[in-house]
Amino acid sequence: MDRSGLLQARVPVDLTMQLPRQSNPTDLEDSVARSTCVYVTYIRTTPEKLWSALTDPEFTAQYWFGMRSESQWEAGSPWKLVTGEGEVLDSGEIVEFDPPRRLVIRWENQRNPELKAEGVSLCTMELEPHGMAVKLTVTHTIERDGSKLIVAVSGGWPKVVSNLKSLLETGSVVLQDYERKH
């Protein structure tokens, strides 16, 4: 909170290449290039309500521009993001399911051939109680330098999470339409 007592959202977006430390600088086979988008916000709600909002397909459609996030919601189960018309835009697998703290999805774009060719990314959603709010951290990573997918999601996550925050706090979304370019 700032001095005025208002909750503030911090929106860091990191599109830089990150290389793990190498024991031998000449051994490049052990290095992995990575692109990452991180979005952090604070939502005035409970961890349980936020968790439900992230995993209930009917609720996701309200803030995710009509798209439903569908799964059996257990580790190893398939996951997909589906339009109201039934088109699967993204799909993958639930890697980790730890309600109401951590959700990890192996994520692959199905709509755009160029983004699909980049392969599988990992989306991690972490929920942490913070006073009367919940800190939500969305981290989307792909093992690829200069990923166009990460550029795309770095434009999408702020819109989706802004709608989620607004819906949970006020009962309505702030953005009605979203032109998905990926």
Residues covered by each model-derived region:
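Hydrophobic ligand-binding cavity/cleft-lining segments
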Residues: 13-70
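Extreme N-terminal basic, low-complexity initiation segments
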Residues: 1-10
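Hydrophobic pocket/interface hotspot
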Residues: 50-51, 60, 79, 94, ...
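Short beta-edge strand/loop motif at the mouth of beta-sheet-based domains
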Residues: 38-39, 58-91, 177-182
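A short, structured loop/turn motif at beta-sheet edges
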Residues: 47-48, 95-101, 126-135
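Hydrophobic/aromatic beta-strand elements that line small-molecule binding cavities or substrate pockets
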Residues: 41, 91-96, 121-128
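A conserved amphipathic terminal alpha-helix motif
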Residues: 17-22, 142-182
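Beta-strand/loop substructures that line and gate deep hydrophobic ligand-binding cavities in soluble
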Residues: 112-158, 175
